[in-house]
Structures are given as C-alpha cells and as structure tokens.
C-alpha cells in the first residue's frame, strides 16, 4: 500500500523571509519584541517534520515506514506542531538577537500570542509570540592602580595571652571535695548524688541514678530540681515533689507530678590551681610554656582570619563605590531570595543582592581580562571549607555538586571570588596599620 507522502513539500529553511519583528520596549537591559512567523512557513515545516516521522512510523497492520500519510497526519500532527513551534522560537529568537547585536542574554521568556489554524484553507493566521529577555551589561574592567587598601595587622601582647588562658581556665574548673560537714551547697558547686524519682509510687525509666554528677545552676535536670539541692549538706537526704513541664520531650512524663528522693554523697567546690604548670597540665599541656606557644598560635590564627576578612570587606566596599552599571533585574531577584534565606530577613536584602551581583560581574570580567581560571583544587577547597561538616560528608556534597547545575554555578562563583580577591589584594597598593588585638576585634565586630 502506498504511503502517499506528498512530493512537492518546500524545505522551510530555503525561505528568505522567515519572520518579522516589532520592538515593543527597550528599558536599560530589558528587551521586549513581538515576532511574527507566516503560517506558510509553519505549515511547510510541519509537513517536513511529518515526512521525517513517516519514515519510521509504526501502526498495526503496516510495516515500519509504510503507514498511510493521512494516518501519520492524524496521529502525529500535534507532536509535529509542538516540535516546529519550539524549533521556530529557538531559531527566530537567536537570529533576532544577532540582528540587534545582543551578544549575551539571560532569562528569555516566551509568551505565545497566537498559533496558525492550519485546518482552514484561507485566513489561517500567523504564528505570533512575544520575546522578553535581559541582556548582559557592559561591565567595566577594574583598574588595580586606583585601588589603595588599608591592611590592618594586630600585635599580640602578653596581656592578650593571659586573657585567653584565663578564659580557658573557666572551661576547665578544678573541683575539690569539701571537708567541712556543715558546708551548704551553693550555685556553681558540683554535687555527687544518688536519686530516685517515682510517679504514683512507681519508678519511671531514667528516674534514678547512683553517684550522678550535678553542677548546680547548669539546668541539667527539670526546672526546680537543682534549686532543691541548694543548701544541702554532705550525707544529707531530702525528698520533694516536682511536676514535669507540659512540653517535656518524653510524652509519658509530660505534665506528670513526680516524687524525688536525693542523697548528697559529696560536695565539690571550684578552687584555683596554684602554679602555671598545674594550670597547663589541667588543660592538657605538658607545661606552661607549651600552653603559651599553643595560645599564641591560636590567637595569631584568629587575628589572621579577622585581618583577611577586614581587607576583603574594604576591597568590596571600594569596588562597590567605584563602579556603577545596570544590573539584570532577574539575576538580582534570584540573589535577593538567596540573601533572605541566608539572613532570614528581608530588610536591606535588595541592596545586598545588588551589591553581590555587581561584585560577581566585576570579578568575572576581571578574571577574563587577567586570564584567571579555576582549577579542580579551587573547587575542592570551596566544597571542603564551605559545605563539608561533621553532619554532611564530602561524598554527599560532591555528589550534589555533580548533579545540580545551580549548586555548581554557586560553588564556581564562590571559588572565582576567592581567587580573584586574593589576586587583587596581592597586587593592589596597601598601607599597613598596626592595632591591638582588642581593636582588631572591635573592627571585626563592626563589619
């Protein structure tokens, strides 16, 4: 049986005038055009598409490629129309941007206004759609010769080291048992207790313990429990009742009244260590000298981190103030949503988003001008330092990176920012300013 494929179909690409366009609006980076494609072109493209489909079309009772053409039309007309419309939009939109000399664009939006009615013999109507998009702005190249930065450097003194060690000592208190039998327990004392808790005279799960350590004022037990222990003496026993909170995490205990019995086995109070070496050994170091060396290193690393962030902040402020150009609205909107998620607030989110987009575009242009490219190591550093944690493994993050294009774009953007800013700071003119550790912390806190 004949396939009845028409032999006089004209290839649409041979037409000289495929579409016409009309400018609807141009506002800074935003463009809007109305594009009209003749119904003849659409019809010819559909016929060509149907011929391609017919070569391999399958239908019960016919061999592959031998399906009657009228059945091909009936079964595949809508599929062919969708294919042709999408292909036409891609071709015409791309060609239009070349004609109006838009080299790069973002977020094109297509609104189909009308489709031709190919079932009519006359007045089929043309294919009409609206194309909206934003062009990429012309981004200026950063002139490093015009950038002068203040490099803050902290000078570590003995007082800083002593203050740091004193703060560590509070985290490693030295407790000693009280010998005075008349001593009454106070807040911040450590008690060694036996206790039992019962509800309706039945011991509940987790309601008892032997030689259990309680730091008074720590809030380890339910509200009111530790208050009952204040004033008790070593060897004393006390009974009291407390009610569990209504929102207590163990549902079976929530809101229940419990009777507690407590015996104080020992009371320990904080006592200062006498020598520097005792302090060092208490914290886990061989001697005081080793502790000082460690503290110096810790403070130095903390200062370097603050110094780096301060000079980067100054560089960003300088670039933000020195360069101005139109920003793509849709890109800013997307960044604004990210800012609001990060800061959990909408105040100033638009301003911060505009700043981030501007800096990202400046960095991108600078990297092209200075041929700064990313390596695998740059990407890995961002993944490890920014996203891997004790709760999120490297394998999990890297798998997400490989499968999610948006996350890839985010990570690459961060990696490029770090590499470009390091390059700029290294090359830019810098004036060193010596400050104390306290002054450095104040500057950092005011970022």
From Swiss-Prot:
It is an enzyme of class 5 (isomerase). The keyword Lyase does not apply. Its EC number is 5.2.1.8. Its main location: cytoplasm. One of its GO terms (molecular function) is peptidyl-prolyl cis-trans isomerase activity. Keywords: Cell cycle, Cell division, Chaperone, Cytoplasm, Isomerase, Rotamase. SUPFAM superfamilies: FKBP-like, Triger factor/SurA peptide-binding domain-like, Trigger factor ribosome-binding domain. The keyword Cell division applies. GO terms for biological process: cell division; protein folding; protein transport. One of its GO terms (cellular component) is cytoplasm. Residues 188-273 form the PPIase FKBP-type domain. It is found in: Cytoplasm. Belongs to the FKBP-type PPIase family. Tig subfamily. Consists of 3 domains; the N-terminus binds the ribosome, the middle domain has PPIase activity, while the C-terminus has intrinsic chaperone activity on its own. Involved in protein export. Acts as a chaperone by maintaining the newly synthesized protein in an open conformation. Functions as a peptidyl-prolyl cis-trans isomerase. This is Trigger factor. It comes from Wolbachia pipientis subsp. Culex pipiens (strain wPip).
